[in-house]
From Swiss-Prot:
Residues 438-681 form the Peptidase S1 domain. Residues 131-172 form the EGF-like domain. Glycans are attached at residues 64, 174, 406. Ca(2+) 3 binds at residues 226, 236, 275, 279. Its EC number is 3.4.21.42. Residues 1-15 form the signal peptide. The modification (3R)-3-hydroxyasparagine is found at residue 149. It comes from Bos taurus (Bovine). This is Complement C1s subcomponent. The gene is C1S.
Amino acid sequence: MWCIVLFSLVAWVYAEPTMYGEILSPNYPQVYPNEVEKSWDIEVPAGYGIHLYFTHLDIELSENCSYDSVQIMSGGHEEGKLCGRRTNKNSNSPVVKEFHIPYSKLQVIFRSDFSNEERFTGFAAYYVAEDIDECTAFADAPCSHFCNNFLGGYFCSCPPEYFLHEDKKNCGVNCSGNVFTTMTGEVESPNYPSPYPESSRCDYQIQLEEGFRVVVTMRREDFDVEPADSEGHCPDSLLFVAGDQHFGPYCGNGFPGPLTIETQSSALNIIFQTDGSEQRKGWKFRYHGDPIPCPKEVTANSFWEPERAKYVFRDVVKITCVDGFEVVQGSVGSPSFYSTCQSNGKWSNSKLRCQPVDCGAPEPIQHGRVEDPESTLFGSITRYSCEMPYYSMECEGSEVYHCSGNGSWVNKVLGIEPPKCIAVCGTPSEPFRSTQRIFGGSIAKIENFPWQVFFSNPWAGGALIDEYWVLTAAHVVEGNDIPVMYVGSSSVVTSQLSNAQMLTAERVFIHPGWEVLDPSITRKNFDNDIALVRLRDPVKMGPKVAPICLPGTSSEYDPPENVLGLISGWGRTNVKSHVIKLRGAKLPVAPLSKCREMKGVNPGIDISSFVFTENMICAGNDKGVDSCDGDSGGAFAVQDPKENKPKFYVAGLVSWGPQCGTYGIYTRVKNYVDWIRKTMQEYSAPSVD
């Protein structure tokens, strides 16, 4: 058995890129063998196409060249498939079939089946590299704008103000980096209203002075950007970014956003992005700088000057706190402050607050107390009171104070002055009830005469009329500028005086009308026998120490005849020179003539030679009750005719008398009230050494 072995020849040929070449079927020009498949990979230098042409073609003919064929492939695409016999169509050219391939590579494949009824000689073909116009040879333009062909290739270029992307094919516009700093202006897309560039990103910035916000105004008809796709995404878009604020992205025919965009920033970024597809006319808008507003309310409980509906950058206002409120900076309070609307839309001094005025703790007072108020802020109330019953308010209605808007405690009567507690005058803690009418009077308690002052040298008396002042007779302190005085003791025994209040004189004021005589001359003129002693320290009042009232200046304080007055002291009695325990007595007022008619102890002294004036009061009787030596300067106390309750005023001061136990002369204090008050007022403050 003979086995016939058939073989097929399969060949693959590759060569370096060349500018031309020849391709021949197997055994050409002889009969090609059966069952052959051979391919040729043709490659010319990049940038060239291939011109392939056949000068001979003799291949078994079949439908669709399904038996034997020569096939031309380019990039997986069949450029042609040939079979049969071909002859040249032009006698001047040997070419029977040709192909112009715009690529630098192609493949030629020859196939034959297992038998041929005739002798076919195959094909002869040639190729040559030829320049192609890439700018027109392809359905898709290789360049987005300008295509430039050259031998073996091409390059893309762009219009002015455009640049070529890294792919060397697409153009973009260099539209980033533009910064607009004017207060008004217009911004538009590249080429507006001509189509904007594709595949671009434009970044613009509006940068205004701090304190001004960017406001954009757009007309709908000035906006035409490729519309959104079916999913709502914008292929081309315009976006505004101002800090944390984002407006957009916007796209479509006609601006879809608000026609006025008010940002809250002085800087606005405009981002315009396009893809590589559809381009439209783009957009334009205007902008301006609007001063950044500040909120109207800086702080509560205040009012502003000037009053405006709107406050903007650089506006300055004066903020004044309403009554009862103040601004506290450190430890200093002020009723107002200034604030400026700043570039960030906030007020300067915004941390300052109008807070209730704090009047602080009420001022303490002497001889009184003040309630601890629940609060010391504006509108709070506090009350003062005096140490009753020995002190009372100097002014009626001065007890209640309220914290006022100016930070002071204010009283309706006294204003900002604190109240003053003054000693209650003319009211003994124990009334003097003795009815004894004998020379020397009766023993008394100091509580009966709490105004009684004891002068130890000379032995005399005085009347306390104020915490700093003692009233006495001029002849008591004449030549004695620093008298030693005591109050608050019934007994003037040295051991008892240690429990009394010792008074230190600061200054002595003798009435200017008092006649100063040589001590060797017998005094017959006691007119103006009155003096004041200013104390260095205030006297503390109590049940044993209290002042007597001064008289008024009206005629009611001229005591009529037979009105009883009280006298007290440690003067001489009918049994001894001086007493050590306080004695008191009641004396009636008598006509001055009674004192003129009296005869003195010394028959050699003519009483009629003594001076009698209207500045004197005569009091006493012939029953042995009278003031005497050692009582000088003491008060002749009479009940105040204008008071319902017993209250005594100093009607007179013990001055002189012709004889103890009868009538005596008293200085009429009413006539000196003006001098007393003037002196006390002028020297009210203690002197400072």
